[in-house]
């Protein structure tokens, strides 16, 4: 999908679905975005936040996003979400969009969720969304990792890690999750 089409889909559909009745500011003043890729969601959300830190695994994407965000409220860190270089309980909120299906195994997905839990402050909010498994999306990922997360298992996985107030919703295209780190 072309970047302009994807940006419109993010703005008009994906982000409103992911946040539901919440606003970006509900994430607090020090927010973490995991896996921003080229930063399309970063562009759309950063204006509604005080401080945003984005952690991106791909060095080229992290560098390009860092250059583009210089002088803004966004700090870009090149790093692995399964082993984040942040102190525990640093962030008031965390978010990730259309990224989990790029994590190669269920175990690494759970490790990533555990790291998000670790770096969230007690009571911190996680907002996440991704696509549901489909043959069409699998075809788009022929030369890429495609390991969609089953939303039917997500509540138990989050609860095991320590999240509470877990809300999961699905539709024909994807799922959204909102959860809080237990105080």
Regions found by a protein language model. Give the residues of each.
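Class I SAM-dependent transferase core
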Residues: 1-11
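Short catalytic micro-motifs in class I SAM-dependent methyltransferases
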Residues: 98-102
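Class I SAM-dependent methyltransferase SAM/SAH-binding core
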Residues: 32, 37-83
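A conserved beta-strand element that flanks and buttresses the S-adenosyl-L-methionine
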Residues: 95
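A short glycine-rich, Lys/Arg-flanked "PGG" loop and its adjoining helix->strand segment in the class I
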Residues: 110-122
């Amino acid at each position: 999908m072309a970047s302009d089409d994807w940006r419109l889909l993010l703005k008009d559909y994906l982000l409103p679905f992911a946040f539901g009745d919440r606003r970006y500011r509900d994430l607090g003043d020090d927010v973490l975005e995991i896996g921003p890729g080229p930063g399309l969601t970063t562009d759309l959300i950063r204006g509604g936040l005080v401080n945003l830190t984005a952690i991106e695994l791909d060095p080229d994407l992290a560098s390009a996003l860092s250059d583009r965000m210089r002088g803004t409220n966004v700090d870009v860190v090149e790093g692995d979400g399964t082993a984040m270089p942040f102190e525990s309980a640093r962030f008031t909120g965390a978010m990730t969009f259309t990224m989990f299906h790029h994590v190669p195994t269920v175990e690494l997905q759970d490790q990533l969720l555990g790291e998000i839990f670790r770096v969230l402050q007690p009571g911190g909010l996680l907002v996440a969304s991704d696509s549901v498994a489909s043959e069409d999306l699998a075809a788009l990922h022929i030369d890429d990792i495609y390991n969609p997360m089953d939303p039917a298992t997500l509540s138990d996985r989050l609860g095991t890690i320590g999240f509470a107030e877990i809300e999961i919703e699905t539709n024909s295209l994807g799922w959204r999750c909102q959860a809080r780190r237990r105080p």
